[in-house]
Amino acid sequence: MPAERPVLLAFASTWEDRAAAFLDRLQTVLPGADIILVAEFPPPREFAGVRWIPWFPRRTLRQNIARIRDELRGCRLAWAALVLDRLLPYWPMRAAALWISRGRLLLFNEQMNHFALRPGDAPQALRFLRWRLRDWIHRQTHPGGWLYTQLWRVRHPRAYLRPLFASIALAAGFHARFWKSLRRAPPLRLPDGGLPDGVSIVIPSRDGRPLLEKLLPALERELGQIPGEILVVDNGSADGTARWLAQEHPAVIAEISSEPLSFSAAVNRGIARARFRHVLLLNNDMEPEPGFLAPLRAAFEEVPELFCATAQIFFPPGRRREETGKAVWRRKRARPDFFVHCIEPVEGENLSPVLYGSGGCSLFDTARLRALGGLDEELRPAYVEDLDLGFRSWRMGWPTVFVSASRVVHHHRATTSRFFKPEELQTWVEINFLRFLLRGAGDAGLFGELWRTAVDRLNWHAAQEPKRPWAMFALRAACRAYRYLRPLPPARMDERLILAAGSGAIAVFPGRRRDPSKPLVFVLSAYTPWPLSHGGAVRMYNLMRRAAEDFDQVLIAFCAGHAAPAREILDICTEVILVEREGSHLRPMTDRPEVVEEHDEPAFHAALQLALRRHQPDLVQMEFTQMGLYADDCRGVPTVLVEHDITLDLYRQLLAERNGWETRQQWQRWERFERQLWRKVDCVVAMSQRDAAMMEGARRVEVIANGVDLERFSPSAEAPEPRRLLFIGSFAHLPNLLGLEAFLRRAWPRLREAGSVLHIISGANPEHFLDLYKDRVQLSLREPQIEWEAYVSDVRPAYRRAEIVIAPLLASAGTNIKILEAMAMGKAIVGTPAAVNGLEIEPGADALIVPSVEAMADAVLGLFENREARTALERSARRKAEACYGWDAIARRQAALYCSLINRPPRAAAS
């Protein structure tokens, strides 16, 4: 931006929807001045000419100011402006505006009236302060204001009870946290001696004879093929259940209590009498489908040290499905929400971890259940016992999984609703959840966080109208926290990882059958390799497909949302584990690169650790640099890091283009992280000899180049469309956007005048990435001679139609698979040196490589006119692809690497 042009620096310290009015108003303040917006989010689309500087709320004030000042280099700041929005004060942003403006600051109110910080605008400033004071007094003296609330409480002294109870509850939690940091029970040990194989079915029942009449015949049929027993705990029934059982079902064992017991006490009586290896806890209002036991039992053969396998729950037709069996810790919780909930299973998933198994339809390991002491009888009369039991088992490293093929129908609260009111049930849930925190959570720091959040939630509910008595009852109970504390044995699993494992972020999908004769390879990836929407996916899928002949594979990958994996992936993997990742700009700047921080997810750590225990792989391969952060979880297993790009090299190139503060910060962090990572893993895979030469200090480096499917991508006999250009590059990759922007600005005007048509394929979610990188790239793709598509499942027709493929990259790391595809299709390629980094390409023979983006216009126009030169490039490109870049040969090099790392000769791996 020319230094002589003035700029208005707008700090959007207001709501996103008010930013448009703010920018509208600024355009009238200094006509002709460029506006630069400092905001969390990009400017609205109608303000395409407004430059954006992102504001990062979790970064320090100093870091944000440094970023803004760097972006203002070469600009003359005429004025800074900010909005004094009462409801969204943004104090750090206000401080930055004051610091950067050096007094040249315009202050706007919510009505977009403004004044400057100068003596001449004192009257306007005083009017604003007077208006704001009147507004403050009005709010304070009306319902919702602090002063109004205090005066109202003086007139209604009982209203002080709620904040008083909340304060006492917080103090009780502080005491409990201190107590937990000091007290520990001895380590837990499993009892000696095995139990016979079979299932003991424990059914608590109170006046449930009509339900048992339907349930017991189905259970007796279920136990016809396996050893087992049915124990009915007759819990204070007055309907003659015990006498009826003796007459109609003499094989059923009846444990009789003359008085009603709590749910935990009743179930524990049944557990104490169980004779078999597994205990099925089943409510009498459950209706199991035939064959529901077999999948539950099979889970214990699949998952080592499994504590519980829980069934999928359905509700009768016409009723809302309140439970699914997939009970998880709520990841995104609004203030009123409870902490756990049930989520819908994903089609095809099985053995996904859940926080706990429903106490009404779950199969347990009897020895482990008894070692934990059964259900906690302090959680009375009912509810939250299963959550407490599941969490305590996870602490011991004993997981709970969801078994989708085991199905039951729940006639919800068919017993409790006959004896208790909904208000009573809600009260028990709330009080027992507090007791669970006190008795089940051992990590003092985590307990403190959860306790504060739980008390805050109850305090909020207790303040609502109409009154919610259950919230006040629970707050009062929280004040007596000391009564329920108990020491816990040392945990074998981090409690924060337990909540992550049981958050619903992990979904497990079985693939093809495991072949024990084949080595097992874990593939950790930032993305799933299908669909083939970017070069990394193309490489992963082609090598995994070929590796599947000699190796079994488990894919653990991030995803934006759970969906059944494509059949193409399930056919080459024994299991696919998908972990949801929710990207966010609300992260502090640490000593690691931003992308690494974004991929450091507790749920992925939990998924990986559980999978390592279950499958015990021979090798772990981490695809993409950021996934190397999980190397520490894989100690004891050979590790391979696949460097699709050397990211520190990419940022070094970006710095050479523009020495910006943000780029410099990220480059410094990549330098530290990437070089440390090379020394940590057993082998680093580079895409080219050029990349391998940079990996100083690595234990071992192997070059396994990118490739192309030579059969799928082959020359076409049909003639291309004259003067048609093709650019393929995912907008998720910033260098693609930077290169395309440079091409459109520096070369495209001449080509457009010559009648060219540019076809752009940008990959999935291009609008998202255009917004994400709006501070770096401004693209205008809406013009007649530009055809723009997002994700295209089959790009071959696009290659066939194109006369020339362009690759105008300014910076690049790794090697470009799209170049290889174009070569295999026999297309003439015009690109910059960065576009062919690391490829064995002879410039002028295999592709036309020009020194700059500007020079691409002449090169393209020349090839349009010179068909012979274009044909020579096309033939040479295809020959080079055939000679050097077929996937089959590349896959053999990868297989040899695997075998060398796991000390198994290739022939043995293939047998």
Give, region by region, the residue ranges found by the protein language model.
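A conserved acidic beta->alpha catalytic loop
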Residues: 218, 234-243, 766
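N-proximal low-complexity "stem/linker" segments adjacent to membrane-targeting elements
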Residues: 161-221, 509-517
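Active-site-adjacent helix/loop segment of glycosyltransferases
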Residues: 395-486
